[in-house]
C-alpha cells in the first residue's frame, strides 16, 4: 500500500521537536506515557510562538473547563525565543494533563497544530489559539454539539463565532475583507472562519489536506470531506501579554495564493457516497444442499 508523503514529513518534524535535549523535552516523554495509561476523551491543541505571560493563565482555564474529565493539553511551541519554553517547563511540574512539543525551527501555526494532532490521544480534538483571546469555558458548548451529531453518524466540526471582537479597527476591516473573499470564491458561509476555538473528531481532522495556513480554511475543508460545520457564539477578549504575530499586508498577500490553492482542492474533491464492507454469509445461515438419494 502506498504511503502518504505528507504524513511522513509531519512525523519527521515531530521526531525533531522531541529530540531537543532539554528538561522539558525529557518530560514530554513521561507525560506521553501518563496520557497513554488512561483513556483520553479530548485533546486540546494549543500552538504558541512567543506567548510568554499567556501560558499559565490559559492552562489553568483549560483545566477548569474540563474538570473531572479525562483530557490532555498539548502545547506546541513553534521555536519561541522568549520565555515561553521556560513557562511551559515550569507548568509541566504541576499539571499532569500537560504535554509539550517543541519545533526546532519555526514552521507556522498550521504545522504546529498538525504536530499536536499526530501526537494526540483523544477521539475529539479541540484547537485553541495560545494568545488567550478565546475563552476555554466555551469548549463544553462546542463539544456537546459534536457528541450529539456523532450519535446520528454525522461528521461535525463545531467552530466559534466571536461576539464583540476585541481587535483593532484595521484588523476588523481586514477580517471582513477576508470573509468576503472566502464567501465569494470558496462558498464559505461560516461567519467567522478565522476564530481559533473549535472541536472536531480526530478521524475527521486527519482526513483534511495539510498545507501551510490550512487552519484558516477548515470550514471549507471539512465540507469538502462531507462534514458539517456548526457555528457557536463564543466570547472574545483582549490580550493580557504579548503582541499579534500577523501583519495585515503579509496576511493579505499570502492569503491570495492560499485561496487559489483551496479553490484547486475544492474543485478536485472526490465524489463518493458511504463505503460499506460486504461480508460473507455466516456458516449457520447458509442453506445446506440436500443430499442426493442413493441409487
Segments (PLM) and residue ranges:
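A conserved acidic beta->alpha catalytic loop
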Residues: 77-86, 132
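Short, acidic, metal-binding catalytic loop of nucleotide-sugar glycosyltransferases
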Residues: 61-70
Amino acid at each position: 500500500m502506498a504511503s502518504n508523503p505528507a504524513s511522513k514529513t509531519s512525523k519527521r518534524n515531530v521526531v525533531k521537536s522531541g529530540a531537543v535535549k532539554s528538561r522539558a523535552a525529557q518530560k514530554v516523554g513521561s507525560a506521553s506515557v501518563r496520557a497513554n495509561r488512561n483513556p483520553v476523551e479530548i485533546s486540546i491543541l494549543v500552538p504558541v510562538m512567543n506567548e510568554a505571560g499567556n501560558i499559565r493563565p490559559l492552562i489553568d482555564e483549560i483545566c477548569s473547563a474540563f474538570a473531572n474529565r479525562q483530557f490532555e493539553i498539548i502545547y506546541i511551541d513553534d521555536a519561541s525565543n522568549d520565555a515561553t519554553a521556560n513557562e511551559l517547563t515550569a507548568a509541566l511540574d504541576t499539571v499532569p494533563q500537560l504535554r509539550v512539543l517543541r519545533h526546532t525551527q519555526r514552521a507556522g501555526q498550521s504545522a504546529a497544530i498538525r504536530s499536536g494532532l499526530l501526537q494526540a490521544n483523544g477521539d475529539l480534538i479541540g484547537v485553541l489559539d495560545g494568545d488567550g483571546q478565546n475563552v476555554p469555558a466555551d469548549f463544553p458548548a462546542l463539544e456537546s454539539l459534536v457528541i450529539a451529531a456523532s450519535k446520528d453518524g454525522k461528521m461535525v466540526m463545531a467552530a466559534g463565532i466571536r461576539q464583540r471582537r476585541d481587535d483593532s479597527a484595521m484588523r476588523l476591516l481586514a477580517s471582513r475583507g477576508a470573509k468576503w473573499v472566502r464567501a465569494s470564491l470558496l462558498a464559505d458561509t461560516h461567519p467567522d472562519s478565522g476564530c481559533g476555538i473549535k472541536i472536531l473528531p480526530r478521524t475527521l481532522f486527519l482526513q483534511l489536506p495539510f498545507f501551510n495556513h490550512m487552519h484558516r480554511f477548515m470550514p471549507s475543508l471539512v465540507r469538502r470531506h462531507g462534514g458539517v460545520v456548526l457555528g457557536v457564539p463564543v466570547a472574545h477578549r483582549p490580550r493580557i501579554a504579548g503582541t499579534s504575530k500577523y501583519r495585515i499586508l503579509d496576511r493579505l498577500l499570502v492569503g491570495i495564493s492560499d485561496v487559489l490553492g483551496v479553490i484547486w482542492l475544492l474543485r478536485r474533491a472526490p465524489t463518493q457516497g458511504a463505503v460499506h464492507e460486504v461480508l460473507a454469509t455466516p456458516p449457520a445461515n447458509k442453506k445446506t444442499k440436500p443430499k442426493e438419494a442413493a441409487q
